[in-house]
């Protein structure tokens, strides 16, 4: 029998390849997150707490109540996010998945913008501000101008991109010209945008007449994103725009010369500078493009879903986009999947609340998923995946 060659010794086994893959890590991250969330569901459930007071007398009541609480909570999450099999019609049943995709659309677009900065080594925290100014610009063009249908929609979307790009470009200029920390500048720009929006909604140019709450007029029908599946579903053309934006991110960062420069600056700014790449110019362009994409997300949100501007138009999209971009490893496919996941937890959380589960628990589930996915070594150790990556002991090593 021939002795094992070095090539055979270095060839990883199937188990080792599984252990090194990211897919099992993501799966186990969800498993651990939902297991810990199940414990929190039990603690928050009144029936479980009551049955626990006589656990040793009638343990079956406790286990039955625990099972019912967990199953009903996650069943409600599934029905609220994916498919409501208890609905009377198929339209109502599938509307939950369509609603999840609708909620995910602006979130994914904003996360794609965040990913541009992350891939280039810039930590953009200004998603909220860029989203707000993009929404405001698109809304103003939508209700303030009278244009032909297609031109009106394109103009409103372009205004959102331009405004978001301008807002991100301010931070990029400060970074390029004065080496100002982008984390600090984008956070400050967030607060400026929030207060700017609050002021705009008090002006005659933005505030709708005869309304009690600060709100703009509704955008005109010619500027609204058309719905893709009829009036019974809210999914609109923004979903297609989101897919095109993901394709643009892939092309920009993987196939274009500009994207290569961005990645080079992100990997090693000094080496990029020596190679003749202007780090300052790259930083400015990165923030310009990132802000434009986030502004597009704001425009899609106001033109496709909200149809009017209010002081809560950004919601938590700006900060959730940071998490989605990190969760998706700043890649187009990963961001789309992570965005749908976050949107599903949001839409399904409303159903969970009807089962007596606190709505804040949904945020806890999101945080747990992010926590575990952001720490692959922890997940591998907890799940035993790290044992699969240990090198094999060959026959020669055993004899030695």
What are these regions (language model features)?
Residues 38-82, 206-215:
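Interfacial/capping segments of alpha-helical transmembrane domains
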Residues 288-367:
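Transmembrane alpha-helical segments in multi-pass inner-membrane proteins
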Residues 26-42, 107-114, 135-141, 161-164, ...:
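Hydrophobic core segments of alpha-helical transmembrane domains in multi-pass membrane transport
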Residues 166, 232-308, 332-333, 337:
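Helix-loop-helix "hairpin" substructures at the membrane interface of multi-pass membrane proteins
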Residues 15-24, 118-126, 147-214, 218, ...:
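Short loop segments and helix-boundary regions at transmembrane helix junctions
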Residues 1-33, 38-46, 267, 274-281, ...:
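Cytosolic-side transmembrane-helix boundaries in multi-pass membrane proteins
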Residues 40-46, 71-145, 157, 161-183, ...:
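Single transmembrane alpha-helix segments in multi-pass membrane proteins
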Residues 76, 81, 186, 190-255, ...:
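Transmembrane helix-bundle core of multi-pass membrane transporters
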């Amino acid at each position: 029998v021939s002795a094992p060659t070095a090539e055979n010794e270095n060839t990883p086994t199937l188990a080792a390849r599984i252990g090194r893959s990211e897919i099992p890590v993501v799966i186990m991250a969800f498993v651990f997150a939902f297991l810990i969330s199940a414990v929190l569901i039990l603690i928050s459930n009144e029936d479980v707490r009551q049955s626990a007071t006589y656990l040793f007398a009638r343990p079956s009541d406790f286990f039955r109540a625990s099972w019912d609480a967990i199953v009903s909570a996650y069943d409600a999450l599934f029905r609220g996010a994916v498919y409501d099999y208890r609905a009377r019609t198929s339209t109502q049943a599938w509307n939950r998945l369509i609603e999840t995709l609708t909620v995910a659309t602006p979130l994914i677009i904003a996360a794609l913008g965040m990913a541009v900065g992350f891939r280039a080594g810039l930590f953009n925290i200004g998603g909220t501000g860029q989203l707000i100014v993009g929404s405001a610009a698109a809304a103003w063009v939508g209700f303030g101008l009278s244009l032909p249908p297609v031109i009106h929609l394109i103009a409103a979307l372009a205004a959102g991109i331009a405004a978001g790009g301008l807002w991100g470009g301010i931070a990029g200029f400060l970074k390029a010209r004065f080496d100002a920390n982008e984390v600090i500048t984008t956070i400050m720009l967030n607060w400026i945008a929030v207060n700017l929006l609050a002021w705009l909604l008090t002006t005659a140019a933005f505030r709708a007449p005869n309304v009690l709450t600060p709100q703009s007029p509704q955008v005109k029908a010619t500027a609204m994103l058309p719905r893709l599946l009829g009036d019974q579903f809210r999914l609109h053309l923004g979903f297609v725009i989101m897919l095109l934006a993901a394709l643009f991110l892939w092309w920009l960062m993987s196939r274009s010369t500009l994207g290569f420069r961005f990645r080079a600056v992100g990997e090693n700014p000094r080496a990029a500078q020596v190679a003749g790449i202007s780090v300052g110019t790259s930083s400015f362009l990165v923030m310009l493009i990132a802000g434009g994409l986030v502004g597009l997300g704001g425009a899609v949100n106001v033109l496709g879903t909200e149809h009017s501007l209010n002081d809560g138009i950004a919601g938590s999209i700006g900060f959730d986009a940071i998490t989605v971009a990190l969760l998706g490893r700043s890649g187009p496919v990963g961001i789309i999947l992570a965005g749908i996941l976050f949107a599903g937890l949001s839409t399904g959380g409303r159903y969970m609340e009807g089962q007596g589960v606190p709505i804040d628990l949904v945020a806890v589930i999101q945080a747990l998923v992010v926590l575990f996915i952001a720490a692959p070594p922890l997940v591998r150790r907890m799940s035993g995946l790290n044992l699969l990556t240990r090198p094999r002991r060959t026959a020669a090593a055993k004899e030695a």
